[in-house]
């Protein structure tokens, strides 16, 4: 499914929220895809998925969308400047893992701004290392990432972030 929230970043006011699949308020017990031959149990499971507000009730690992958080935290902490240069060979090895950039051959030399534009994993791994665990958690706290948004919608899930003491241990 798809979930989208559009909100005012200054005060958290929600302008729009949508979940897909969605349901008709006039026919809440009608599945979107009626072509399936489902048992009663399967139909109930599908209805519960359809009625669930995944925007606030589900948790996700954010992937590359979290790079804006890393960027903000690093710039605020002075761990990086816009013109700092980095080198992307196409991957970076962390412990026993090869973490790849989406550009297999690498971006080569690039500034921080170019690394953001390219969503370059090796650049962001270096930025995260410069920032350190404490700096990253400080930035996340300042941006409210580690707590509920406390919006006026029932069923908001808690964060799934690791505790700071367990990161890098």
Which residues fall in each region the model found?
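Beta-lactam-recognizing serine transpeptidase/beta-lactamase-like catalytic domain environment
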Residues: 2-64, 69-169
């Amino acid at each position: 499914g798809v979930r989208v929230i559009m909100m005012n970043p200054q005060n958290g006011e929600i302008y729009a929220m949508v979940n897909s699949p969605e349901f008709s308020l006039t026919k809440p017990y009608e599945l979107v895809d009626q072509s399936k031959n489902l048992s009663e149990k399967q139909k109930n499971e599908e209805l519960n998925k359809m009625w669930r507000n995944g925007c606030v009730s589900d948790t996700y690992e954010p992937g590359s969308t979290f790079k804006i958080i890393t960027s903000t935290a690093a710039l605020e902490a002075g761990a990086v400047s816009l013109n700092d240069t980095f080198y992307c060979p196409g991957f970076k090895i962390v412990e026993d893992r090869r973490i790849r950039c989406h550009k297999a051959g690498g971006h080569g030399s690039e500034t921080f701004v170019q690394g953001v534009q390219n969503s370059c994993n090796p650049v962001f791994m270096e930025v995260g290392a410069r920032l350190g665990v404490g700096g990253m958690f400080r930035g996340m706290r300042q941006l409210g990432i580690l707590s509920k948004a406390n919006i006026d919608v029932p069923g908001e899930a808690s964060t799934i972030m690791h505790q700071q003491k367990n990161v890098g241990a």
